[in-house]
Amino acid sequence: MASSRASSTQATKTKAPDDLVAPVVKKPHIYYGSLEEKERERLAKGESGILGKDGLKAGIEAGNINITSGEVFEIEEHISERQAEVLAEFERRKRARQINVSTDDSEVKACLRALGEPITLFGEGPAERRERLRNILSVVGTDALKKTKKDDEKSKKSKEEYQQTWYHEGPNSLKVARLWIANYSLPRAMKRLEEARLHKEIPETTRTSQMQELHKSLRSLNNFCSQIGDDRPISYCHFSPNSKMLATACWSGLCKLWSVPDCNLLHTLRGHNTNVGAIVFHPKSTVSLDPKDVNLASCAADGSVKLWSLDSDEPVADIEGHTVRVARVMWHPSGRFLGTTCYDRSWRLWDLEAQEEILHQEGHSMGVYDIAFHQDGSLAGTGGLDAFGRVWDLRTGRCIMFLEGHLKEIYGINFSPNGYHIATGSGDNTCKVWDLRQRRCVYTIPAHQNLVTGVKFEPIHGNFLLTGAYDNTAKIWTHPGWSPLKTLAGHEGKVMGLDISSDGQLIATCSYDRTFKLWMAE
């Protein structure tokens, strides 16, 4: 056993030199330190290298190095349209979530209507409608709804104010006058209706033959007399009730009376200082009225209204109260009242027996130009520069008919003796015929090539209609039928006034050419 151990030990000792390996020598650790600190030191000392000034500049230009303050992060100023839309939509949704919308569906519909949106869409329920309103309000803002409501309230209030009936409190004399007019007009209306019944009993053949004779006579009308009336244009002419005199008004301020049919000057009425708009005879003048009484009335552009007798060249009285132009004057059929139209958008009624203004009637939006009275004395018709006409009941003060249809100013208005037709002449070159019974326009006559200055029905039966215009002519139209019968041509200037004698035998026209003409059948 000892020998075996010795042999093994010896074997080991003999093998050791072959397997001997050199021991590993420990190398000391190398500490490089912080590269960041060294780089900072190198940069601080201004050393050149890869990351020197040139390298730093190249890195910044290449976009590999970003130098920031650490507090502010700069972004691109330009934002794409898509990004802007996304931001706007985000803000809109944010606003929409903050808007309170009523859960009452009727109120939601009212809000949509106020905003001018459809109150409902196809297949839309209350929830979808409410959401649609919310989205709309998020775009236009809730102030839009408030503004719309305020505008609606204002328009509603103004509409209520417009529809509100307002009036001037009239004097007691107006009440007395209304009662007097009612008592005056009712018997005349009964008489007119009785005459219409008697006329209807006349055989049709007789009436037709009479109408044919009248039309034949009208077609034969010729210029019987032409007279220079003044140095200035003649604005108005009017026959006396007995058809023996003709009154003319001139722009020189003079009014003249002429004999008919020889056209001799009888009187020159001096009193106006400016353009005279109209002169009219009293309904009973030259028939039953004393020549010393008031027989004529005239008006002028300075607002003056004067009353005249047949015995004096000076005015008998002045009617004061108009501050602007008075366009027309007209006597009531009774002769007690005088109507005046004024450019202050009103017309007035004067009681000459009481010597006071009893009615100051407004209703037109512009100046009132012409006035006419119904032959019964119950109604008055006015035509205004606002292109509208009105028919007034003098017994109650109400406007019973509104004449709407002309495109321009109304310069003439007249009632037919049949009691239910009204004719109006306008600046739109037409003459319209209105029916009081139907309360509408029944016919429009394309009468002239220039503005129509006057209209006049034949005063006995209203069998024809006369119109005058700025196209230098006057025309005669059948009634009924409204077909042209005769054109009265001869004036060298605008036809400014016209009239038909009370017996229906003569027609007078006056013109801008300073002449007046009488027309008579051969």
UniProtKB/Swiss-Prot annotation:
Entry annotated with the keyword Transcription: no
Annotated WD repeat ranges: 229-268, 271-318, 321-360, 363-402, 405-444, 447-487, 490-521
GO MF terms, alphabetically ordered: U4 snRNA binding; U6 snRNA binding
Domain of life, per lineage: Eukaryota
CDD domains assigned: WD40
InterPro entries for this protein: G-protein_beta_WD-40_rep, PRP4-like, PRP4-like_sf, WD40/YVTN_repeat-like_dom_sf, WD40_repeat_CS, WD40_repeat_dom_sf, WD40_rpt
Recorded consequence of changing R192E: Decreases PRPF3 binding
Main subcellular location: nucleus
UniProtKB keywords: Acetylation, Disease variant, mRNA processing, mRNA splicing, Nucleus, Repeat, Retinitis pigmentosa, Spliceosome, WD repeat
GO biological process: mRNA splicing, via spliceosome; RNA processing; RNA splicing; RNA splicing, via transesterification reactions
The protein, known as: U4/U6 small nuclear ribonucleoprotein Prp4
Organism: Homo sapiens
Lineage: Eukaryota, Metazoa, Chordata, Craniata, Vertebrata
Primary gene name: PRPF4
